């Protein structure tokens, strides 16, 4: 989709009507026809505050997506939010950069595969611990052909401890 599509406008309207902030992961095509794996930050007034484009592309993603080249901090009700997408979490420098730029919390919309559960567990906890920051990992759930995405979304405290988590396959 493009950033001004009806699809995105519906989410903006939802945020405004319900007074909520939304981090919306999606594929975005820019004005030069480049395609990015992105996340939009939509505020509770229904305005797009900005977007983050995934910087670390996994396996075959390079065939389809352009890599992003910057990390962004979003100020939401005086809370500084960073966003990483999925495989970005595997690179300590990304979370460290956001922390040094003042992030209070990092959200990580993801699509981790069941065979990588141990890495998901380690990365979410380690990035929180090494940066003394909250991590909210939101992992997709479901099956697509032979791809099993296991859920297990979680909130990690700055000590690397799991505060709350959904079970696998939820």
Kindly give the residue locations of the regions a language model identified.
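CN hydrolase (nitrilase-like) catalytic-core segments centered on the catalytic cysteine
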Residues: 3-23, 90-170
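Active-site catalytic loop in hydrolytic enzyme cores
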Residues: 3, 9, 13, 30-101, ...
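Recurrent small/Gly-Pro-centered beta-turn motifs in extracellular repeat architectures
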Residues: 26-28
